[in-house]
Design a protein with these regions (language model features):
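Glycine-biased, small-residue-rich flexible motifs in mid-sequence functional cores and linkers
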Residues: 1-3, 80-398
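Short, small/acidic-rich helices and loops at N termini and domain boundaries
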Residues: 1-84, 385, 397
């Protein structure tokens, strides 16, 4: 049986965004060995919750095999951490996707510089122009542009790269065949026609769910060597991508077109150490060694990133993601308690104390999925209930 089937089984059991599938495979030796070990082996791992054990038992490989066959019949690529073609940069992050579904052609991280370009959906003229022009210049210099395929800054970044005859990748928060944001259906076709790719960790026919945008954002930064925030107000979801970039030891860049509320998030990032830029050359200068000898330099940077401490970036709550979710198919929200917190947020908050605790620990302690934990943390950040630290660690606020 194709080894990817066992990874799909794991992805089905744990959902998108969890670090546990890769951790389990490392301990078991292979995804197949993990599957064949059965409940006796799985229950020996103390960080796997009872609910996750039940999911591992409930999902079978026949369903996973059918899913793989379906994707391959449609001409899509399915990558797992142990297959050629899986992005090397994603192997570096804490929670790499167990399965990556791809339509089109991914850039070669060992030879191409990749820059994530993100920002608000409701951008003004200055931010939109900067996103398009800088992405155009990046493409002209051979860099790949990674973004989220949404309206606003994302769309301009993709179109700039296409106009520059470069390659661009849209990382989606749903299955590749789900009718997400049909206003951009033509853009997605243009991305493929220009030699780029559509990427997701969600199985086919998966709609946009609560927390999917935040979970997806770690892949935009994870697939890139650096991330540019082209325009972001104080409560933009793009700032979560910047936080991921810092935690993943990626370079963080900001464009500040005006000293106004529209760029308040970018101004805050600059105050916290992000590099302020005006042109693509400002970004590429940070990767000058790679441009001279791409393969050698990029591999050296990957090795250095493992040891380099994460850059501290201030965490701010989301508003753009909430607006995006309103466009998508919604999952009914749980009834809100009197305290004003969702049930998931209550559980996460109850697990936190004065000592920083990693998001993966919160998953294990609460029994929630990675996406649910991330959504709960975002809610708690919005209300000022928690503080965040580099490396996806959190405490209760003072």
């Amino acid at each position: 049986m194709d080894a990817r089937v066992y990874w799909i089984w794991l992805q089905n059991a744990f959902g998108a965004g969890s670090a546990k599938p890769v951790q389990l495979v490392r301990r078991a030796g292979s995804a197949e060995a993990l599957f064949r070990g059965g409940i006796g082996l799985w229950s020996s791992f103390t960080f796997v919750s009872d609910r996750e054990l039940a999911a591992m038992s409930a999902y079978g490989v026949r369903e996973a095999e059918a899913a793989l066959d379906y994707c391959l019949r449609l001409g899509q690529q399915v990558y797992t951490p142990d297959t050629p073609g899986y992005p090397d940069l994603l192997r570096e992050i804490y929670n790499p996707p167990a399965v990556l579904y791809v339509r089109g052609t991914l850039p070669d991280a060992s030879g191409d510089i990749a820059i994530g370009v993100v920002g608000t959906r409701k951008a003004g003229k200055a931010g939109l122009r900067a996103a398009r022009e800088i992405s155009y210049e990046l493409a002209q210099e051979g860099a790949a542009v990674i973004s989220g395929g949404a309206l606003g800054i994302d769309s301009e970044a993709h179109r700039g790269a296409i106009d520059g005859r470069g390659r661009t990748v849209a990382v989606l928060p749903c299955g590749l065949d789900y009718p997400y944001l049909m206003d951009n259906a033509n853009l997605r076709r243009e991305i493929l026609d220009s030699g780029g790719a559509l990427v997701t960790e969600y199985p086919m026919q998966t709609p946009v769910q609560r927390g999917a945008f935040q979970t997806r954002n770690r892949l935009i930064s994870g697939m890139a060597h650096g991330v540019l925030v082209a325009e972001a107000p104080k409560k933009s979801g793009a700032l979560i991508t910047a936080r991921y970039a810092a935690e993943q030891n990626r370079e963080v860049f900001v464009f500040i077109g005006e000293d106004t509320a529209a760029f308040a998030g970018c101004i805050g990032l600059a105050a916290d150490g992000a590099a302020r830029i005006r042109t693509a050359e400002d970004i590429l200068r940070a990767f000058s060694a790679q441009r001279k000898s791409a393969r050698t330099a990029l591999l050296r940077q990957a090795a250095e990133n493992v040891a380099r401490p994460a850059r501290r970036v201030r965490v701010v709550p989301l508003s753009d993601s909430a607006a995006e979710a309103a466009e998508a198919e919604k999952t009914p929200a749980a009834p809100q308690p009197e305290a004003g917190l969702s049930a998931d947020a209550q559980r996460v908050l109850a697990s936190l104390g004065g000592e920083p605790k990693h998001a993966a620990v919160l998953e294990a302690e609460t029994g929630l999925s990675a996406g649910s934990v991330l959504a709960a943390l975002t809610e708690l950040e919005l209300l000022g209930k928690i503080r965040s630290y580099p490396g996806q660690r959190f405490t209760k606020s003072d």
